[in-house]
């Protein structure tokens, strides 16, 4: 049965298709729906409000209702909190699966530091709350550093994807230089940073939402 992804940008559908292909998923494993208006509403309101949360949750539940849909994956970090309001147990946050990966890494290596990068100001609070809640130990959040990269989202919104990728890549290198053991790209739109990563000083490839979410779903299928 297919996975249905709800996106707020057409480019995110391409990213998930690329990630699925790299993981060896069969063609047509993912069905995509794009609702740009939901993110535009959130940005106009300065973030998620109660009405938009309810609206988004209702759409997600409706998408999950058909029996032939295995799971619904919300790929927009800004809208992520709406998943908590869903009635269906088939709805997942893509960035939530990445957050659990980070929590597991911190549990394995209690001394490591992880840098979280976001770009859209409207996603900062939702991302912070998500990753802190995913941690298993009380003080693990002290080893997380969340940065909203200044100016990056404006580049994305202008359609300057090469400039956006360059800005996020520079931020990732700076995070490693500051002592991070792992950089985590918390928005799907940043996938290109990892895809074209040129390692410096053996720094690991940053973790991405799409690959982490699909890997987690693949494990759940076993």
PLM segments and residue spans:
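Non-catalytic structural scaffold of enzyme domains
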Residues: 1-222
């Amino acid at each position: 049965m297919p996975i249905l992804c709800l996106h707020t940008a057409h480019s995110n559908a391409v990213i998930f298709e690329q990630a699925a292909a790299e993981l060896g998923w069969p063609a047509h494993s993912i069905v995509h729906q794009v609702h740009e208006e939901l993110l535009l509403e959130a940005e106009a309101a300065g973030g998620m409000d109660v009405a938009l949360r309810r609206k988004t949750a209702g759409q997600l539940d409706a998408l999950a209702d058909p029996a032939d849909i295995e799971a619904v994956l919300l790929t927009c970090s800004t809208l992520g909190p709406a998943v908590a309001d869903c009635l269906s147990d088939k709805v997942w946050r893509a960035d939530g699966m990445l957050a659990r990966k980070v929590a597991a890494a911190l549990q394995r290596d209690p001394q490591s530091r992880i840098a979280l990068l976001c770009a859209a100001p409207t996603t900062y609070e939702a991302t912070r709350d998500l990753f802190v809640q995913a941690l298993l130990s009380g003080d693990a959040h002290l080893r997380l550093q969340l940065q909203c990269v200044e100016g990056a989202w404006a580049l994305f919104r202008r359609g300057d994807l090469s400039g956006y990728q360059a800005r996020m890549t520079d931020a990732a290198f700076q995070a490693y230089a500051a002592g991070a053991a792992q950089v985590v790209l918390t928005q799907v739109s940043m996938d290109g940073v990892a895809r074209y990563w040129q390692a410096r000083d053996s720094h690991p490839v940053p973790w991405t939402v799409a690959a982490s979410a699909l890997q987690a779903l693949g494990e759940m299928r076993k």
